[in-house]
Every structure is written in structure tokens, then in C-alpha cells.
Amino acid sequence: MCASFSPTLDSRSRQLLRTLISCYIQNGEPIGSKTLAQQAGLDISPATIRNILADLEELGLLNSPHTSAGRVPTAHGYRMFVDSLVQMQPPSEDDIRRLRVEMTGGGTQTLLGSASEILSAMTHFVGVVSAPRREQFVFRHIDFVPLDARQIMAILIFADNEVQNRVIEPRRVYEPGELERVSNYLNAHFIGRTLADIRTTVLCELRKAKDEMEQLLAHSLDLASQMLVPNDSEDIVVTGQTRLMALQDLSDMDRLRELFEIFASKREILQLLERTIDAPGVRIFIGEETGMVSMEDISLVTAPYAAHGQVLGVLGVIGPKRMAYDRVIPLVQVVAQVLGTALEPPTMP
């Protein structure tokens, strides 16, 4: 999670804050002292409750809308809630079994799409999943196809049956027979290894003097070094954007338009997800913690997903600050675990 905001509160204040935020998340209306007296389970007078609420407001945890006598949580209030007050409601065993069934079979892209759709459908918000870098996947086969005198298409097939085409411009002209021998050499020596591992080996070998290498090896390493340039145009799967239009919390059309532009470009969402890829467990960005003005009314709950102990990407849920964190946080955790397991055979070593 992001930096916590945890002023010291006594047990009554914590209970009232927890109850107020839980009630507000549920019904979206400012919460008054009478409602809290009924819901909090504390044997204290409404006057005492009002005094405690005033103290919580002074601490910046609550706010009083001008049109209501009740109070609503601030971003700091939500932060304290998710850091130390929320009581998680994880998915049931039946739900987890259904998730595993829905994310069984299919290629990597299909699984990513399924994960994003599940997150959106089960929360009624936006589901996002960053795609793994192809360099992290196991290489199974390569073919070279000449396009013209100067360009060659490298066709890479991975262990998860995904195919990637890369166009390269070699330093010399290769005859079809040479390309076949080079592909045979690379297939014989590098099958079963990741592109990142292959790149390290190739660059190491290229440092050796050219006259120390066989001609076939030299040509193979030359083509491989060009083919294995890292691909930075990683993708992201976004599902359920239109669900946000029905939320009363996001009724500002100008702000909503900006948000949809972010979804369309994907770049800023991907950058936000990448900030969490090296952090274990769930991370939560509330409002301005995202670093984007257009998302100051938004929360993002993320978790990395991994296969065979290697982190591949990040998934999460984007929704209003007034979201059911008690359900969304454990759901994101579970979907990340299920997706990672589904990607293990046979996509990773």
C-alpha cells in the first residue's frame, strides 16, 4: 500500500471512523451522529459521538459537506481506513473455483483478457492488466523470412503458442539458404530459454573477436543481436470503462472525459501500474496519490502477478474512492494468484 496516514486514535474513535466510512461506502450519503449511534455498537451518547466526529474532522479524516449535517471521509480518511481499519471479505471458495475455471486454457492474451473482464464484472468498475514483456517468456522456435533486399522478418514462436513478428534490417544481404542455416542454429542452441537470457548470451559472445568464431555462428549472433532489441511497446488490457459513467461519484463530465482519454491512450495507466511491479502484495492509490489530476476522485487497487516466481505484470481495479475496499482488495489478490498459476504451464521455464 502507499504511504499510510495513521494518527493515533483511541478505540472509540477508530470504531466510529470505521463505521462511518463503511456506511458511506454502502449508501453514498453523508453520515450523521444518529446513524452512527445505531450502527457503531458503542454505548455512548449522540453528543459524545458529535464531539468525536469533530475531532476526526480536525485531524483531516472527515469532511462536512455544506448541504448536510452529516460527514464524509476525506482521502486521508480512506487511507487510514484501508491501512488499519478495513475488515476484509475475501471471495468464497466457490467463487475462487469459478475463477480458476474461467482462467483455464487459452493463450496468454486470452488469459489477460479474462482476468480484466473478471475484475470488472465482479466489482462493476474498470479492470486493468498489464501484459508481460515477451522477453520474459520461453522461446520455442524461430524462422526468418526475407521481405526484400534489405529487410527480414523474424517470426518468433513462444512456449505459450503466442507468435511475434519483428522486422529487422541486417548489416548485409542474406540468401534464403543462409537464413535457413541461421534459424536452424538458433533453434538448436537456444530453444527453451527466455529472450532476455538469449540476449545476454548473444551480447557476451559478440564481444569475442570475429576471427575466433565460425562464420555461421557470427552470422547467427549478428542477426540475433538485431532481433533481440528489447520491445518497450508493452500493452495493457482495459475492460469496463463505461461502467464509470453510471456512478454518481463521477458525475463531472469534464473530469470523466479526461479519464476516458487516459484509458484510450493507456500510456499513463501503464506507467502507474509499472510503479507497483516491484512491490510485493497489494498497493492502493487513493485520489491524488495517483499523481494525475484527472484521477483525484479515483482509487486504484493493484497487485503483481507472477509465474514460477518471476513477476510478469500488474493487474488491478480502477474505481471511485468510495469503493468496497473490503471486497476489492482480496479479489485483486486472488485474481493475481489465479492468473499467475494459469500462466505457468507451459509459458515459463
From Swiss-Prot:
<keyword id="KW-0346">Stress response</keyword>
<keyword id="KW-0805">Transcription regulation</keyword>
<dbReference type="InterPro" id="IPR021153">
    <property type="entry name" value="HrcA_C"/>
</dbReference>
<dbReference type="Pfam" id="PF03444">
    <property type="entry name" value="HrcA_DNA-bdg"/>
</dbReference>
<comment type="function">
    <text>Negative regulator of class I heat shock genes (grpE-dnaK-dnaJ and groELS operons). Prevents heat-shock induction of these operons.</text>
</comment>
<dbReference type="InterPro" id="IPR036390">
    <property type="entry name" value="WH_DNA-bd_sf"/>
</dbReference>
<dbReference type="GO" id="GO:0003677">
    <property type="term" value="F:DNA binding"/>
</dbReference>
<dbReference type="InterPro" id="IPR005104">
    <property type="entry name" value="WHTH_HrcA_DNA-bd"/>
</dbReference>
<dbReference type="GO" id="GO:0045892">
    <property type="term" value="P:negative regulation of DNA-templated transcription"/>
</dbReference>
<dbReference type="InterPro" id="IPR002571">
    <property type="entry name" value="HrcA"/>
</dbReference>
<keyword id="KW-0678">Repressor</keyword>
<comment type="similarity">
    <text>Belongs to the HrcA family.</text>
</comment>
<dbReference type="InterPro" id="IPR036388">
    <property type="entry name" value="WH-like_DNA-bd_sf"/>
</dbReference>
<protein>
    <recommendedName>
        <fullName>Heat-inducible transcription repressor HrcA</fullName>
    </recommendedName>
</protein>
<dbReference type="InterPro" id="IPR023120">
    <property type="entry name" value="WHTH_transcript_rep_HrcA_IDD"/>
</dbReference>
<dbReference type="Pfam" id="PF01628">
    <property type="entry name" value="HrcA"/>
</dbReference>
<dbReference type="InterPro" id="IPR029016">
    <property type="entry name" value="GAF-like_dom_sf"/>
</dbReference>
<keyword id="KW-0804">Transcription</keyword>
